[in-house]
UniProtKB/Swiss-Prot annotation:
Keywords: Metal-binding, Metal-thiolate cluster. Residues 29-60 are annotated as: Alpha. This is Metallothionein. A divalent metal cation 3 binds at C14, C18, C23, C28. Disulfide bonds: none annotated. A divalent metal cation 5 binds at C33, C35, C36, C49. A divalent metal cation 2 binds at C6, C12, C14, C25. It comes from Zoarces viviparus (Viviparous eelpout).
Amino acid sequence: MDPCECSKTGTCNCGGSCKCTNCSCTTCKKSCCPCCPSGCTKCASGCVCKGKTCDTSCCQ
């Protein structure tokens, strides 16, 4: 099974090798599913991604 179903379902099974593209998941940790831009100071390590822009709506 593909460990990363983000592009199909909007959710991820966060396996150690999960690499998401076109991420729309709301349950994945940033380390698994990099929704937020790298270097985004508002996206703390371990946050749950909600968006692709570096602002307060990026992560919950």
